[in-house]
Structure formats: C-alpha cells, structure tokens
C-alpha cells in the first residue's frame, strides 16, 4: 500500500480543497488514458496516489 502525506502537496497548491480538485482532475486524465503519468508507476499505485506524487514533485500545478 502506498503511504503518502499530503502536507507537501497542500503547500504546493495552496489549500486542501484546491488540492482535491487538482488531484482528482489529474487522476481522471490518467485513468481515461488521455495523459500518461509523468513519474514512474510502482506496482499497485492508484491514479490518485500518482496524481498526488506528481503534485508533490512540482510536475503538476494548480493552473
């Protein structure tokens, strides 16, 4: 199971509500297949975890 803290991601986006919107939008993009993940996918990482990791690594922004 992936353990991830969202505190770093919240600091990158601004607040928890915007983080939820940005991460959900990015997870949907990856799930539908329109956009590939920008980081290396681990074994059983779900799209929401991948989206949060991308936000933490500054690969995805609020805009």
UniProtKB/Swiss-Prot annotation:
Q: Which keywords does this Swiss-Prot/TrEMBL entry list?
A: DNA-directed RNA polymerase, Nucleotidyltransferase, Transcription, Transferase
The UniProt catalytic activity note for this protein reads: RNA(n) + a ribonucleoside 5'-triphosphate = RNA(n+1) + diphosphate
BP GO terms, sorted: DNA-templated transcription
Which EC class is the enzyme in?
transferase
Checking Pfam families in the record gives: RNA_pol_Rpb6
> GO terms for CC?
DNA-directed RNA polymerase complex
Q: Which InterPro entries match?
A: DNA-dir_RNA_pol_omega, Pol_omega/Rpo6/RPB6, RPB6/omega-like_sf
Q: Has UniProt tagged this entry with the keyword Kinase?
A: no
Q: Which GO terms describe its molecular function?
A: DNA binding; DNA-directed RNA polymerase activity
Highest taxon listed in the record's lineage: Bacteria
Which Enzyme Commission numbers does its entry carry?
2.7.7.6
Q: Which family does it belong to?
A: Belongs to the RNA polymerase subunit omega family.
Functionally, this protein is described as follows:
Promotes RNA polymerase assembly. Latches the N- and C-terminal regions of the beta' subunit thereby facilitating its interaction with the beta and alpha subunits.
Q: How does it assemble?
A: The RNAP catalytic core consists of 2 alpha, 1 beta, 1 beta' and 1 omega subunit. When a sigma factor is associated with the core the holoenzyme is formed, which can initiate transcription.
- Know the name of this protein? DNA-directed RNA polymerase subunit omega
Organism phylogeny: Bacteria, Pseudomonadati, Pseudomonadota, Gammaproteobacteria, Enterobacterales
């Amino acid at each position: 199971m992936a353990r991830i803290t969202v505190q770093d991601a919240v600091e990158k986006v601004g607040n928890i509500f915007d983080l939820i919107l940005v991460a959900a939008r990015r997870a949907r993009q990856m799930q539908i297949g329109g956009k590939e993940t920008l980081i290396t996918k681990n074994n059983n990482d779900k799209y929401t975890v991948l989206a949060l990791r991308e936000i933490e690594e500054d690969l995805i922004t609020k805009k």
